[in-house]
């Protein structure tokens, strides 16, 4: 949600800012803007809508050596040019961009800013006026005024501040919102995400919560809010320009769906050696062994991935697994077992709700494992342990390959722990072989895109509602399938256990209601699901059946190659991802950037 990019000391600041904002589009936004300063002149340009509209307004007229840019996803105030960032102080001297939510902005306004002319509706405007207030009223330097403001401001934030009288410095601070420093040769950068700086640098420096950074073209100094200097090393990010481009694909989502077989094979090479033995950190294995219950905490697609792996983990490790929605657990922690362990699933590693849970876990001394796609992310830094899903950059808002990679990574964890526990079922589960079969199954499904596209056009082109049904692991897949379809096609979709039809939901079935059924369990469960299909068809529903090989009947629509039951949630989700993609495409929607959604939810 929202994105920041800044550069100091480069003659090409405007182009770098625009290119950086384009790389941050996937995070979600409704307006954007840049501020550029240099050669004793400065310019501020903002627009509502896409980056292309901002770029058209900028044209060739905006130039400078230092600047900050921002994509805004509205939280306080409507998406207007006035509320778009960057924001200026009353005199226009100070310019600020901000991600996050200032919780005490009304108190600050009433205490310090009664004489200030506040023009917008945002909490960000409060912050920049507060800095100017301390410069003018307390006669403080910009740095000291910024520090004083940071001591007062409460909430989540990532700030980048420029004094238009000083074209050589960007002041940066963060708390609970992601922000990185990019180190260049004769210039330095600041950004919410390393991907926005990939063209300019591969060397980065982390900023921890409640740290202030003074960024100049040839130096970066990290301080705490009391002015104590903090030594901080840098690291190199393993990113490639080809990873963040669409290539020949029309949309990132389709590219990322197609990348899933490669991701499965990457995980095999990461978490298993050439002999097929598990290559999972022994400290992680020991910590899971010592737990009497595992709590998987996540949001959205990651939450569904946790459900998809729950039964497998329990059967392979003999350890009970409980699922929790991070946004609920952050404020309503239930009664826990005596020796709990938290597993946090997050593609970005920056999910604010999950971080709130992790903060509480750390306070309680509960061991934690983050499973994420982003090394160096907040959750990976603050958890006891981390496992990476190695899915590569996921740009489309609708997550696909991160889901399947999370399930596969949990499979490696479960097998490793089960073997350490001496479980015969874990030892007999040839995960390397079975996951290779999954990769082949995915490839087979991907070869049927034209068939799936035609089925979608017949079933979903004009509908307003749809249902997914399934039993066992298929039920867990229906939840993810429904989320995918609703978030990018805007079709109101519900996924539920097929056996629950008669307990209420069947009342919504009418003529031509689309019902998509998943069948991958054993023949007995499959027979029950087919009975449920007949119930909805007899009431006028149009049914589409996705069935695993060996359970198919004449008239079934999509056949998925058979895989090990522990991994069926991976193979069965692939056709549902394609269904969502084609439903969105055929409705003329922006597949990669659905309305009102952000890729990384970094505010609560």
Curated annotation (Swiss-Prot):
What residues form the catalytic site here?
Answer: 2, 599
UniProt keyword Cytoplasm present: yes
UniProt record, GO biological process? carbohydrate metabolic process; fructose 6-phosphate metabolic process; protein N-linked glycosylation; UDP-N-acetylglucosamine metabolic process
Task: Describe the reaction catalysed, as an equation.
Answer: D-fructose 6-phosphate + L-glutamine = D-glucosamine 6-phosphate + L-glutamate
Keyword set, alphabetical order: Aminotransferase, Cytoplasm, Glutamine amidotransferase, Repeat, Transferase
> Per the record's keyword annotation, is Nuclease included, yes or no?
no
Localization in the cell: Cytoplasm
Pfam short name (any one): SIS
- Record-listed E.C. numbers: 2.6.1.16
Listed GO CC annotations:
cytosol
- Give residue ranges for domain Glutamine amidotransferase type-2: 2-218
One molecular function GO term is:
carbohydrate derivative binding
Stored Gene3D superfamilies: Glucose-6-phosphate isomerase like protein, domain 1, Glutamine Phosphoribosylpyrophosphate, subunit 1, domain 1
| Domain SIS stretches | 284-423, 456-594
Q: What does this protein do?
A: Catalyzes the first step in hexosamine metabolism, converting fructose-6P into glucosamine-6P using glutamine as a nitrogen source.
Q: What is the name of this protein?
A: Glutamine--fructose-6-phosphate aminotransferase [isomerizing]
Q: Which organism is it from?
A: Streptococcus agalactiae serotype III (strain NEM316)
Q: What is the lineage of its organism?
A: Bacteria, Bacillati, Bacillota, Bacilli, Lactobacillales
């Amino acid at each position: 949600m929202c994105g920041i990019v800044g550069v100091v000391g480069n003659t090409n600041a405007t182009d770098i800012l625009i290119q950086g904002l384009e790389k941050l589009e996937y995070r979600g936004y409704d307006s954007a803007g840049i501020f550029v300063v240099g050669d004793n002149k400065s310019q501020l340009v903002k627009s509502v809508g896409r980056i292309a509209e901002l770029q058209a307004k900028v044209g060739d007229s905006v130039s400078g050596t230092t600047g900050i840019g921002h994509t805004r996803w509205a939280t306080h105030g409507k998406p207007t040019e006035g509320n778009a960032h960057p924001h200026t102080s009353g005199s226009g001297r100070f310019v600020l961009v901000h991600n996050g939510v200032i919780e005490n902005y009304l108190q600050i306004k009433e205490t310090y800013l009664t004489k200030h002319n506040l023009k917008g509706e945002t909490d960000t405007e409060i912050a920049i006026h507060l800095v100017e207030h301390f410069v003018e009223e307390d006669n403080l330097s910009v740095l000291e005024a910024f520090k004083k403001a940071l001591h007062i401001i409460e909430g989540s934030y990532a700030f980048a501040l420029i004094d238009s009288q000083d074209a050589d410095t960007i002041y940066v601070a963060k708390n609970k919102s992601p922000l990185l420093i990019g180190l260049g040769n004769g210039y330095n950068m600041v950004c919410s995400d390393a991907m926005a700086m990939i063209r300019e640098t591969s060397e980065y420096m982390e900023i921890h919560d409640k740290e202030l950074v003074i960024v100049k073209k040839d130096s970066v100094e990290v301080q705490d809010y009391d002015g104590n200097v903090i030594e901080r090393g840098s690291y190199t990010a393993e990113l490639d320009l080809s990873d963040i481009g669409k290539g020949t694909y029309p949309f990132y989502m389709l590219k990322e769906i197609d990348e899933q077989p490669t991701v499965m094979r990457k995980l095999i090479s990461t978490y298993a050696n050439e002999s097929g033995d598990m290559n999972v950190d022994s400290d992680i294995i020991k910590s899971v062994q010592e737990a009497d219950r595992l709590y998987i905490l996540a949001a959205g697609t990651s939450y569904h991935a946790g459900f998809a792996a729950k039964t497998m983990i329990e059967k392979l490790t003999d350890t009970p697994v409980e699922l929790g929605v991070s946004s609920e657990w952050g404020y309503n922690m239930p009664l826990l077992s005596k020796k709990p362990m938290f597993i946090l699933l997050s593609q970005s590693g920056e999910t604010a709700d999950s971080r709130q849970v992790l903060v509480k876990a750390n306070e309680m001394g509960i061991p934690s494992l983050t499973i994420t796609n982003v090394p160096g992310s907040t959750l990976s830094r603050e958890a006891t342990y981390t496992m990476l899903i190695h899915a590569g950059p996921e740009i489309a808002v609708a997550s696909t390959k991160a889901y399947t990679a999370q399930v596969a990574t949990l499979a490696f964890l479960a097998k490793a722990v089960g073997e350490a526990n001496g479980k015969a079922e874990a030892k007999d589960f040839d995960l390397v072989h079975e996951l290779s079969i999954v990769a082949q199954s995915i490839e087979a499904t991907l070869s049927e895109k034209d068939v799936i596209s035609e089925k979608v056009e017949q079933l979903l082109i004009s509908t307003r509602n749809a249902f997914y049904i399934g039993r066992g692991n298929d039920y867990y897949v229906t939840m993810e399938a429904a989320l995918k379809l609703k978030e990018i096609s805007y079709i109101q979709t519900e996924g539920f256990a097929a056996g629950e039809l008669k307990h209420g939901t069947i009342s919504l079935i009418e003529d031509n209601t689309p019902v998509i059924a998943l069948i991958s369990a054993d023949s007995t469960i499959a027979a029950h699901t087919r009975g449920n299909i007949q119930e909805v068809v007899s009431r006028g529903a149009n049914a589409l059946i996705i069935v695993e090989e060996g359970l198919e009947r004449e008239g079934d629509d999509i056949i998925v190659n058979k895989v090990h039951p522990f991994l069926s949630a991976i193979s069965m989700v692939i056709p549902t991802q394609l269904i969502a993609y084609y439903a969105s495409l055929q409705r003329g929607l922006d597949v990669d950037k659905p309305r009102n959604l952000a890729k990384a939810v970094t505010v609560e």
